[in-house]
Every structure is written in structure tokens, then in C-alpha cells.
Amino acid sequence: MTHSYTLRSVYAHHFLQAPNATMLIQEGQHISYLQFEQLVQKTEAWLLQQGVKRSDHVAVWLINRVEWLAIFFALARIGATLVAVNTKYRSHEVHYILANSHAQFLILQLNFRKIDFAQVVEGVEASSLPHLKTIMMVDADDNTPATLLNRPVVRFLPTLVQTSGAQINAPSVTDASALEDLPVIFFTTSGTTKGPKLVVHTQKTLSEHVRHIATGYQFGASGDALLTALPLCGVYGLDSALAAIAARMPVVLMDFFDVASASQLIKQHQITHIFGSDEMLRRFAEQNPEPIAFTSLKLFGFAAFSARFIELAQELIPRGFPMCGLYGSSEVHSLFSAQHRELPLEERVLGGGTPAAGSRASVRVRDPDTLELCAAGLSGEIEIKSPTLFKGYFNNPEATAQAFTKDGYFKTGDLGYLRSDGSFVYQSRMGDTMRLGGFLVDPTEIEDVLAAQPNIESAQVVGVEINGQPRAVAFAIAKNKQCPPDASATLKGVAKTLAAFKIPAHLWFVDEFPTTASANGQKFQRVKLREMALEKLR
């Protein structure tokens, strides 16, 4: 039997077999597979009317909502690419993504909570976006501007389109093959160069991976339900949601993570699966102090972004938090692997595990100094080969080439080791990239914004742990060393262009940065800077 790996194949068979089964739940509203299919058809038709065509890039800047997923599936049917934009981003980051993705269209909503999307967009330099043609506004009202960034604004109104909604018209074998290999989404990830890179996944790499998750994580038993508390614009939120859909498992969408609301939803819908961070676990535990917090949960897959997570697991697992360590990235997908649940607690909660794809994926570890492959138990750089790996970094062939070995393994930049049974353990990032707010952040991105502030000559940023949370802190050299600018005022200036989780918790002025000589010139000693920061925080 030949399998189709278009994005529509993720749920097409469920629509045919159980059209009235619940697919999504948001704010108490149940959306069936039939209702979702009708919305996707209308959205596809509307986007085509607006001029979206195959190979176009459409930036989507929305909170978690049914429309996000409908737009995604509709774009995939057209053969266009969704450019995922984090709702936490501000003008600096939004401009970077729009410019570097070559997005022709931008879909956003008017506002949400304290976020005024239109106002943020106004801070983007319109003249440096030659590809952008049209802006589409969800939830438009009488206050919606006629233009943004000197481009026309059209109201996003797919529900007004008339379609049959009767069936999924499967593409021909030839057309399906062409769609499978088209880029379906660009995720953003950090890197060693200025600004994030755009990670390209095709319909095949994405749809095949979420099927691996559904099977490998044993999704879809009677009564299973997923709470999507993470943003759909990131791999952890999107991959888990699509895997649940592939397994015909209801997905409860949260537009914004709030621990009180999330706790209520878990109990109300008898949620069995949730994915997040150790910080989310801490907040759940504080919100639900009873001896057994949740009785329905089967799996709380988590990534540890701070220290002392083993102590946390020892406390929470007996209280109804079935914690399991995971591994993933934008390049290899989230939920790439998970630890076996029968392992001792201390091993079960470590990052890494066994690939969801089973024998179709291969993991090895290489010594960064000798470049020899490591035996089990010896640490080195984790390398991964899988049919669902990303296809490259958009418009960045040099970075793409550097990311792979000659025999097709992705060089993750992560430190880890193999176990004797073939599973692996993730230990830490090998480079300077920081994990902030649940996202990988390149410090040079923050450094560039700091250096652009008045009276700042240059800046260096490192990550430290403050009150149990990973935070960025900064050192800067003032143009006038005798009279440096006010640190608080400088950080307020940074806040105008960077997402809140990227803003340094502290800024200290120094006369010079610690450096060390190398064959390629002077290099900044980030380890020394981190030590200096920890000393100041004592």
C-alpha cells in the first residue's frame, strides 16, 4: 500500500470514517472533522481569491486558535509555505522574519490581551520588505487600518466563501508526490550567525514525523485527549497537536498558557497527554497542591530548561504528574525521542531517549576534539539521521551544508552520550545558545539590539539561572566609559524591540570584555563572563 505524505493525509481518513468525531476543542466549542474540513476548504478558496499560489510564503502571526490550523492546512493544499511567527515577537524580530522569509503575505489579528499587533507592525521598516504584498487581518473591525507597512489590509473572511464541504478530493498520485516535497512551514531557530535561521520542513517530513509520534508515543487509546498549551508557531506545540489529530485524539487548544485555566481544562476534559517544560510543571504543582493533583494524565512529556529537575520529578511523579524526558529541535522535530517509561526515575526524566521513528532513525555521538565516534557512555556531539529531518535553512546554503555530515547526519550542536541499549541522553548545548522562555536564543541577537542603544559601544550576553529560571544577563562597554548610560533606561529601550523573555535581567558596564587568543584572533570568554555574572548575583 502506498502512503500519501501530504499534510491533508494527517486527518483525511478520520474525516471519511468519523466526520462527526471531535477534532478540536477551544473555549468550550467542539469542532468536528467535518466542520474543520469545511473551514479548511473555505480558507483555501479565500486565500486563492486573494492571490496566494503555489510556492508563496505566507507569514502567520496568530495566537493558538482553530484558524491557525485551518490556514496551515489550506496553505498546504495550495502548495504554499506557512512562515511561523511567535506572538511574543516585537518589531525587530518580526521584521527579520518577514524580510528573510521573503513572505508575500502576512496574516495577523488585530490584538490579543496586551498585544497590539498592528502597533508592533508599525514599528517594522516597510521599505526593506520588497516581497511583501498584502496584509490580512483576522478579527478585523471598524478600527482596522486600511493600510499597514504601506500595504493594503484585507479582512480575513473565509467563512463567506461558498464551498461544497462534501468531501476531500484526494490529489492525483502525481500531484500528491509534488505536494509532499514542497516546503510546508518555516520554523525559526537560533544559530551562530546574527539573527535566527529559518528551518524548512516539507509536507512529507512533517506528516511522516507526526505519524511516528502517534505510533511511538501510543496516542489514540479510548479516552485520550491532548492539551495544547504551547504555541502552534513552535515545533513542540504544532508537532504534538498534529500527532494527536493523526491518532484521532481530541486536541484542546489554549490561546495562551495560564496555569489556573490549564489545570481546569485538564480536569474538565480528562486530559491524558500534555507537553511542556519543567517550569510549567512547577507552576502546575503550585496551583494544585493536593496529594494527587491529576488522575487522568498518562504522560507529561517535558524538556528541562533549568536545573534540579530530578528533584522536581521525585516530588511530582507520585502526585499524578507522569513525567518523561524528551528530545527535539526545529531541525529534527519535537518529540523526536522519549525515555522509556519503565526506566528508573533518575533516568526516565533525562532528555533524550529512543526515537519515535524506531529503526528508521539513527543517533550517534562524536568526540568534538578527535572527531571519532564515541562508545556508549562517552559524551560528545549528538548526530542524527532520519527521513523526517529538515531540508535545510531557507536561503542559507552555507549554513545548511555546515549542519550536515558527509553521510547525511545532522550535527545537532548538543552534548550527550549513548546508552548501551542504543538510546541516548541529552546533556546540554555545546555552544553559547541560550534557552529563554522555552525558546533557543542566539545571544548575538540581543547583543546587536543592545549595541544599537544610545551611548553603547558593544555588548556581550550570557545565560545564567536566576531564582531557578534561565535568564539572559548583559555586559556592555559604554562609548563614554567615564559616564556610562543608565542601565535601567537602556533595558527599557531594548524592550521596545525585543520579546520580553529576551530582555536581560541585568546590565553591567565594564571597561573591557575578557578575551583569549586563538588562531582566528581574539575571542570573548563567555565562560568568564558567566562567572562574573554569577559573582555579581551572589
Predicted feature residues:
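Conserved AMP-binding/adenylation subdomain of ANL enzymes
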Residues: S207-A225, C233-H273, Q287
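Gly/Ser/Thr-rich phosphate-binding loop
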Residues: T272-G276, A285-V349, S362
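Conserved AMP-binding/adenylate-forming core of the ANL superfamily
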Residues: T2, N20-G51, D56-R65, L69-F73, ...
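Conserved AMP-binding A3 loop
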Residues: S32-L34, S177, V184-R211
